[in-house]
Amino acid sequence: LNNFKNKIAGYLFDKTDILGIVGRSKYQLPEIKGRALIKLDEVDIMQCYTPVEFENYTENIEALIKELNMANLGKKPDGIRVMPEIVTVDMVLSDRIDRPGIGLDTDEIEVQYLELCGNIHMVVGKEGTGKTNVLKLILEQLKEAEVYICDSVGSELGREYKDMAKFYFNNEVDSGAFYKLLEDEVSLRVSEYERVKNDKSLREFCMELTQVVIVIDDIERFINLCKDIRTDLEKLIPKLLDYGISIVEAVTPNELRGFDELTKKLKDVNSGVVLGIPDEQSFIRMPVIRNYKFVIGTGFVFKGGDIKKVKIPLI
């Protein structure tokens, strides 16, 4: 502004902004339409007038906009995206069952998704960072899928989603039945693909099937519940992933320290959601984010090396 000799300041909400434009003045700018301060050699007060009365100005502008819209049959450009103060569930819901929405990207204000066709997705964060909330958000978008749920000690998922699950368990006794159902599903997919493998790829075949997702709230507990079928699970997991069955697992940063094959397979992820302070976990490689302060309802969606900060709706 210092490059401009003559300056005019109309009404501004913050009076210090007026001072920054024209400098000190003996006049106080009143809340009168058209009243302004003008700086020539010194600061004076003036009244601005319009050349016409501008009757029905807003209505005429709206009519002109409508007329232009009707005349233009081309694709309308995207509007300027603005991050809402509160992100709600309906803002991130996906129209595809194989890619549930997680949150709004804080840079581009676009929905970020997880791709669910035969992958392991990790939701990692300390207690109280919103891991179960993310699982609930995903389950809200899987009501047309076949879902297997292994719940936490608190049974938070069971209270709302037990009835929609093909199989639900949170004890060691039911782990055998869980394995048998999964084994049957994989065997069915293998035999079905044998019939059509000359006509389509395995990926194309899996995309045509009902989406099957295993949702685990507390992966460490899941491993303990499945200790009697651990060896069988170690063999089954690679096969079920190959045939399009996905796993979504919640984990805290200090878990999965074992060296058994099942733990190794469940740690081998390249997609997921990081909650809390990114540096506090080592499962998903993240760039250093200095002075990051975690706020509930925020996180990072990670997909094959691409990381997006997102605002996540709370359920």
Predicted feature descriptions by range:
Residues 37, 72-87, 191-206:
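Short glycine-rich, low-complexity/disordered patches
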